[in-house]
């Protein structure tokens, strides 16, 4: 190879290695978020908005009458299906299998969701029109957070990375429960009963030892359709369907769950989540920033993510060690724990998702909330990276 081409070739190989690694999904999300912000504040912002929100003249499912609806209620159900697969694997035979291993991540996730919610309610003064958004700063974007950790490489102890992953997994489970309990209204009992029967059938197939991936995929699709029409958010269908997929190895030494997770995880990380980011992260920055009452919502979310999440996760680790309930990750300093706690404040995907559910009736509140999500996530990511970078020297 000619010498002049070597730098380009080396750069290309480095880029491929990066994109294949854990940092790739996080970096892709950063690029997508920036692209969405640029487009939302460009001369093409109107066209960009219409692309996702224009009512479709023809759609096979009446409830999904726009590209935005297909992404948020359709593609994101598949994202939650992958989340469900991961949760089941981790609980049955992964890092959350042993009770002792669950203690610290569960406590950290619990306080990491409760404290941001309290910060949000305190800043908004529990205003009735804003109260439904209390769960927005309670979420963690695992792709972003792990991407930042991966950028630091071996300078961060493996125990810290594992701690972040397990906290984020428990956090995802908590977010799913919140969506099911808080952001569900107008239940259609007939469709809900149909969803229950489909779920029972899928569970029965698991108990009978049926290990055919296509059967569970078909069942998941039917369950999603029923839940979509029941009034419960269809993301719940993704998680419930995943929990029926068998993890045990069959006679050929294969696992339906592991095979599905291996196939769908890259699709979720490199296609579904970026598409969701493009459709939801774009927010027009106003000429005059919000002030007074209008500032309360974005400020509450940003402080919930940056201050509340950091304080909740770090406080949980400190309390667990102080009361000998659990020990902090092996080989990690308190400053490193603080850095990882800050990274848990990167809400992005899940926070934007909950924003759409919380303020679906008020487009202006959605836009205000997006400012808080993006600002808080950015500050949390920068603080976490800076703290971990400093301790890694």
Where are these regions (language model features)?
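Functional cores that coordinate and move charged inorganic groups
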Residues: 149, 153-246
